[in-house]
Amino acid sequence: GIIVDSRLSAFLERADAVLARLEPLLPAPRQTIDWNQCLAARWQREGRSGFLLPLDVSLEMRLSDLIGVDKQRETLARNTQQFIDGLPANHALLWGSRGTGKSSMVRALLAQHAKAGLRLIEIERDHLADLPRVVEQLVKLPQRFILFCDDLSFEAGEGDYRVLKSVLDGSLEQAPENVLLYATSNRRHLVPEN
């Protein structure tokens, strides 16, 4: 009995010391987002993983505030309405010069449809490889999520565009019906032509 007890005691002391050294390296536990209250979040990379960070967003922007983009506004508004209604909808790339209202249009759509369950997830271009992890967290939720990548472009030889293409093509797996990707770019070609 005494030898087993002293070995067990030594083991527990050592395990305690190891845990004390490891715990500061572990990510802090994250609270689950209440999507009934939270309208937007940003994918935040942390080490080899990441988490959704809730954002406070303004719902002041209206689609009618955007001038000179009537056709684009109507097309994107119709696509978004179809998405909310559970009808087929397309991923969208908004292309144009800086300051032409591309990002504002997406935010105005959130303002218009938040009460109908539309939510916005911002994801940086450099984090596109994490798209499957982000989608995995959203797939079983009742809300409709637009994954929003602002200022999308790639350099020649970068592999990230292949990840994006496979997600858009649905070749990783069937894209969930409650997730759509909207991106903006001020480049005419997302990947430079050779």
Regions found by a protein language model. Give the residues of each.
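Short loop/turn elements that form and flank the Walker-type P-loop nucleotide-binding site
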Residues: 87-89, 116-117, 140-143, 175-178
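Walker A/P-loop nucleotide-binding motif
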Residues: 86-108
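Phosphate-binding P-loop
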Residues: 55-57, 81-89
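AAA+/P-loop NTPase substrate/partner-engagement loops
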Residues: 112-145, 151-157
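Conserved catalytic/switch belt of AAA+ P-loop NTPases
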Residues: 140, 155-194
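Dynamic helix-loop-helix/coil hinge segments at AAA+ ATPase domain boundaries and subdomain interfaces
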Residues: 3-9, 51-75
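Pre-Walker A adenine-sensing motif
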Residues: 71-85
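Interdomain "pre-motor" coupling segment immediately N-terminal to P-loop NTPase/helicase cores
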Residues: 2-54
